[in-house]
Design a protein with these regions (language model features):
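Conserved functional hotspots at enzyme active or ligand-binding sites that engage polyanionic ligands
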Residues: 1-105
């Protein structure tokens, strides 16, 4: 079962333009009540950017990265390779608050 806050390795290619590419960790933000659907909303993680108001920093394993909610996308389960962990409760709370703030502006 795929749950909100899970971190999955997701195959994002093919992409267009400035969309984040490659296979990379992504945090699931779809509510658990929608886990039966064949698509999930995910937020990619990256190590190649600077922290900003809308890109919260997270520690995942032994690495520090950034959540990139402005690159949130819907992906089919077929792109989701395997679960590699989960965000801490505080990180998920920050991510969801960031998304709310982005959409309120």
């Amino acid at each position: 079962m795929i749950k909100q806050g899970d971190v999955w390795l997701v195959r994002l290619d093919p992409t267009v333009g400035s969309e984040l590419r490659k296979t990379r960790p992504c945090a699931v933000v779809s509510p658990d009540g929608l886990s039966h659907l064949p698509v999930h909303l995910v937020v990619p993680l990256t190590g190649g950017s600077l922290p900003s108001r809308f890109r919260p920093e997270v520690r995942f394993g032994d690495r520090i990265g950034l959540l990139v909610p402005d690159q949130m996308r819907s992906v089919d389960r077929g792109r989701m390779i395997r679960k590699i962990g989960a965000l801490k409760t505080s990180e998920l709370t920050t991510l969801l608050a960031t998304l709310r703030e982005m959409f309120e502006d």
